[in-house]
């Protein structure tokens, strides 16, 4: 289950309060690849099992307001979907950054390298 965050402050607070690694999903209602991630990748049993070990956050950037733009700029996300990861020590794991749709196999291959 994803917890929605609206800005950098909420993101930082969520990361600080997490005892697990964190995954942030940049999402928008008009984003076809975001829907594919939700309907295919995030419903895969192996992916579900893997993500149980994470705090899951979602930034809905549909409105593309100033907070949305600031979050995307901070993490180099031009547009959704984008997935950013932090380890349990609250350090960003840039080698696990995912931009665009990934099927369950490719998603797990990237995430399993570091987690």
Spans of model-derived segments:
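Proteins that catalyze or organize thiol-disulfide redox chemistry
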Residues: 1-55, 59-115
